[in-house]
């Protein structure tokens, strides 16, 4: 399966930034996400990438903020993530379909098993966050879907990277290149 049809293959990181655009512009979250897709396409980007999660799966309700509170007043990690987890399967289906209409690849990094499952029908490739690079059970779960995976390796050691790659190679039918 050939995924990347050119080099360099450019991926625009939308993440959850569309929520801020929606608030600033006074438009719906979906319209803001589509606006960012349109802007990425106009810039010549090959793919757009979102982030899919539920706050309950990635942060303790008691975890305190680690960011500058003068910039973002939310005082807990859980509440911060909760602000940006409004989209689910149906919304990502709509974004995937919209990406097909405009001719850009849709990606979303799953941060939990449920997200990995519902995103499977919308994506040809998975993106694994650097925050999950040492989460070998999750990496194996994604690899078991037998689709190519992109691994983010920010702040990782060579050992952690090798372990993650081995987990994919041991589980997936898709060969890494």
Describe the role of every protein-language-model region.
Residues 1-15:
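N-terminal amphipathic alpha-helix/helix-capping segment at the start of soluble metabolic enzymes
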Residues 8, 88-92, 115, 128-168:
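Active-site-adjacent beta->alpha loops and helix N-cap segments on the catalytic face
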Residues 10-14, 48-50, 106-109, 126-128, ...:
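Hydrophobic faces of well-ordered beta-strands that scaffold small-molecule active sites
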Residues 13, 40, 119, 152:
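Conserved, mostly hydrophobic/aromatic
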Residues 18, 46-86:
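Glycine-rich, proline-tolerant flexible connector loops at the mouths of alpha/beta enzymes
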Residues 25-40, 110-116:
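Short, acidic/polar
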Residues 32-53, 122:
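Catalytic domains of carbohydrate-active enzymes, especially glycoside hydrolases
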Residues 70-136:
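Active-site beta->alpha loop and helix N-cap motifs at the rims of alpha/beta catalytic domains
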């Amino acid at each position: 399966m050939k995924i990347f049809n050119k080099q360099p293959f450019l991926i625009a990181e939308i993440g959850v930034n569309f929520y801020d655009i929606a608030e600033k512009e006074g438009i719906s979250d979906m319209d803001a996400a589509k606006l960012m897709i349109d802007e990425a396409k106009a810039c010549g980007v090959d793919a757009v990438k979102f982030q899919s999660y539920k706050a309950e799966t990635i942060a303790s309700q008691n975890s305190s903020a680690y960011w500058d509170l003068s910039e973002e007043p939310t005082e807990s990690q859980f509440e911060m993530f909760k602000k940006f987890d409004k989209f689910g399967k149906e919304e990502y289906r709509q974004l995937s379909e919209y990406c097909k209409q405009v001719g850009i690849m849709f990606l979303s990094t799953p941060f939990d098993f449920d997200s990995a499952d519902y995103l499977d029908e919308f994506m040809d490739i998975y993106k694994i966050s650097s925050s999950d690079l040492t989460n070998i059970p999750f990496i194996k779960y994604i690899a078991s879907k037998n689709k190519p995976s992109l691994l983010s390796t920010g702040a990782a050691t060579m050992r952690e990277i090798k372990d993650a790659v081995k987990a994919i190679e041991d589980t997936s039918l898709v060969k890494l290149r």
